[in-house]
Every structure is written in structure tokens, then in C-alpha cells.
Amino acid sequence: MHGTRSSAHWSTQPGKFDVLNLRMTFESSSAYEIPDLRPTDFVPAYLAAWNMPRHRDYAAKNGGALHFFLDDYRFETAWSSPERLLDRVKQVGAALTPDFSLWTNMPKAAQLWNVYRSRWCGAYWQSEGIEVIPTACWATPDTFDFCFDGIPMGSTVAISSMGIRSSKVDQELFRYGLRELIDRTQPQLLLAYGQLRHCDDMDLPEVREYPTYWDRRRKWVTADGRPGK
């Protein structure tokens, strides 16, 4: 496919040409122009994975929200085709922002880019009337300079400790980042995907934990061995 800004494809399939999504920018107070999200007091009753249709349908009917605690490749299209997949988010009506990875060994430019992409998706969805809860993630302390940008003060923030390995270093990095998140954004509520581990001795705001997909499978297995709904 070929096209320029004068091509019909530019307006009908913008993601194929403007791959940086520069066609839409949003207000920012960040030195890196990471979009600011508006605060919300919405608390989902259920978290549904972006890539699971049956779970999305359940969330849409039961006050849930989409989550992105998945391998990054499973939700790359949320960024690469935002207009085309907007209806998927609108159907549910609420979403956490995409949890693009911040690995400790990633180049800083890639880490910054993933934070930008996450907040951009959230700002875009908010502009379309969708309830959006920011997902916070971090790596080493040098990412604290930007990884919390765009998260509103005193709001609800989603996190997960599911990817934290048994390494004491990894656990301490998670704790350090969580303390920074709380100090910098003062969330009123933390939504945790899975059990929030490694921080039992920390002074935290209210925490609401949501079962993971595998938690639900274990719980919903019926007596005859078939998975429940």
C-alpha cells in the first residue's frame, strides 16, 4: 500500500502511515510531553484481559474494565491501530492504560517511549468518553524521572507485582518504585492485578486486589472438571 497525506488512506487508515500517532497530541505538564490523564474515582468490579472476548463481554455487562497485564505483543495493536480498535474499549466503557514493559536493561529512550505510549492511549480513550485508570510501572531509579509523568494526583492507580521474580534486588526495586509512586502521586486507591506481594510492611493507601486469569480458572473449575464461566 502506498499513500501520502493527500491519499484517502491517510484518513481512513491513519495507523498505517502515521505510526507515531502524531495526528493526535494531548495536554502535558511533563518535561517529556507525556500526556496528562484526568483523575477518576471509577473502581471496576472486574478486570478483563484485552485479548479475551468472552471476558470483555462479561466486563461490559458487569461494570468491569480492560487490563493489559499481558505480554506486550498481545496488545501492541492498542497503540498501532487506536481508531480501528476504539470500539473494543468503548464496548467495555473503562480501561487501565496499556502496561508496556519497562525492563531494567532497556535503553532509556525505549523506556521513555513505552511510558509515552501508555499515557497516550489513556488520553485518547479519555477524549472519547472512556473511564481510564493509569497503570504505573517502573524499572531502576533513573526511570523515576519520567515513569510517573501523566498520572494525576490523588487518584486511582493500577499496579501489579506479578512479574517480580524471587530476586531480592527485583523485589527491592519494586518496593522502591512503589514508595516513589505514592510519594509523587499520592493515590487514594491502588488496584492490584493479582495479590500485591513484597510490601506487607509498607504504609500503603487502600488496596483492592483482583484475581488473575489463572486465579479465576482455579476457582471456577466445576465438579466435573470443566472450567466455569
From Swiss-Prot:
Name of protein: Gene 1 protein
Domain of life: Viruses
InterPro entries: DUF4417 (IPR025530)
Species of provenance: Mycobacterium phage L5 (Mycobacteriophage L5)
